[in-house]
From Swiss-Prot:
Reported function: Reversibly catalyzes the transfer of the carbamoyl group from carbamoyl phosphate (CP) to the N(epsilon) atom of ornithine (ORN) to produce L-citrulline.
E.C. code: 2.1.3.3
Organism lineage: Bacteria, Bacillati, Bacillota, Bacilli, Lactobacillales
Organism: Streptococcus pneumoniae serotype 19F (strain G54)
GO molecular function, one term: amino acid binding
Pathway: Amino-acid degradation; L-arginine degradation via ADI pathway; carbamoyl phosphate from L-arginine: step 2/2
Top-level EC class as recorded in UniProt: transferase
Residues reported to bind carbamoyl phosphate: 58-61, 85, 109, 136-139, 273-274, 318
Principal place of residence: cytoplasm
Protein's name according to its UniProt entry: Ornithine carbamoyltransferase
Length: 338
């Protein structure tokens, strides 16, 4: 008899999970969030050891996995870029086989999707994708939990992603939304439209869920009847040399109050996976302002601090949703079907 449909599975990309499974994980996240708020212990991973592999640096992902593991009674061990050899002095396969004998679960945040897939293939333990260049699945659970908390549902809502339409967050929002029945609009310049295969994948899921997929560079078409406006940084990690080009290309796709008003929905919410470059209160922000004359990038400070903003709720939800994924895949919970 199968005790859990999740036990032992890796969480590498949203497309690997059904709508019912993703909805279950979002619901479990809400439950674990409630337990946390009421200070009720939930040590589903007591005695477990979790490896946190970070090829790319992070604030939210590292903090979320660390606190989630501790709340679940597990011991997290951080291994940064200087601590792991993945493909450098030791193959990913060999590293995976070693870590799988020492740890009960592995988180990986890095560049290559193939690398996280190899870790899952050869470690023999659940592997969780904390971000790769292609997908950002743990972010999606937090995003759609935040949307559900604000609207009480997901199906039939419209989420508009503004900016670089070919990055990992755009890919994941598009596919996950299509699976969950959320209309997803990508508002982006043609040069940065999502890859054809990603759009086709999303359209396939949308046919099943009844969702709508729209890729456009027209602001009026993009934000009409929007419930959620979402943006991300204009330059992803590893692409810093393209900054001048991106600023010029993406300035018309900035989330500002004019765009918010264009949506015509006072109940609209704004999301951002963070960090956000909305002012010059950072070394990076000052540098960009000096070099390019831009003091606010993907979102204006006005929108970032407005009544529409939910990004700090969204950031907190990283912890609760990551906790749900780890508990479901490693905690021997009784989930015979969803």
């Amino acid at each position: 008899m199968i005790n859990s449909v999740f036990q032992g599975r890796s969480f590498l990309a949203e497309k690997d999970f059904t709508r019912a499974e993703l909805e279950y994980l979002i619901g479990l996240s809400a439950h674990l969030k409630d337990l946390k708020k009421r200070n009720i212990q939930h040590h589903y991973l007591a005695g477990k050891n979790i490896a946190l592999l970070f090829e790319k640096t992070s604030t939210r992902t590292r903090a979320a996995f660390t606190t989630a593991a501790i709340d679940l009674g597990a011991h997290p061990e951080y291994l940064g870029a200087n601590d792991i050899q993945l493909g450098k002095k030791e193959s990913t396969e060999d590293t995976a086989k070693v870590l799988g004998r020492m740890f009960d679960g592995i988180e990986f945040r890095g560049f290559s999707q193939r690398m996280v897939e190899e870790l899952a293939e050869f470690s023999g333990v659940p592997v969780w994708n904390g971000l790769t260049d292609e997908w950002h699945p743990t972010q999606m659970l937090a995003d759609y939990l935040t949307v559900q908390e604000n609207f009480g549902r997901l199906e039939g809502l419209t989420l508009v992603y503004c900016g670089d339409g070919r990055n990992n967050v755009a890919n994941s929002l598009l596919v996950t939304g299509a699976i969950l029945g959320v209309n997803v609009h990508i508002f982006s310049p043609k040069e940065l439209f999502p890859e054809k295969e990603i759009v086709e994948l999303a359209e396939g899921f949308a046919k099943e869920s009844g969702a709508r997929v729209l890729i456009t560079e027209d602001a009026d078409e993009a934000v009409k009847d929007a419930d959620v406006l979402y943006t991300d940084v204009w330059v992803s990690m590893g692409e810093e040399d393209k900054f001048a080009e991106r600023v010029a290309l993406l300035k018309p796709y900035q989330v500002n109050m004019d765009l918010v008003k264009k949506a015509g929905n006072e109940n609209l919410i704004f999301l951002h996976c963070l960090p956000a470059f909305h002012d010059t209160h950072t070394v990076y922000g000052k540098d960009v302002a000096e070099k390019f004359g831009v003091e606010e990038m993907e979102v204006t400070d006005e929108v970032f601090r407005s009544k529409y903003a939910r990004h700090f709720d969204q950031a907190e939800n990283r912890m609760h949703t990551i906790k749900a994924v780890m508990a479901a895949t490693l905690g021997n919970l009784y989930i015979p079907k969803v």
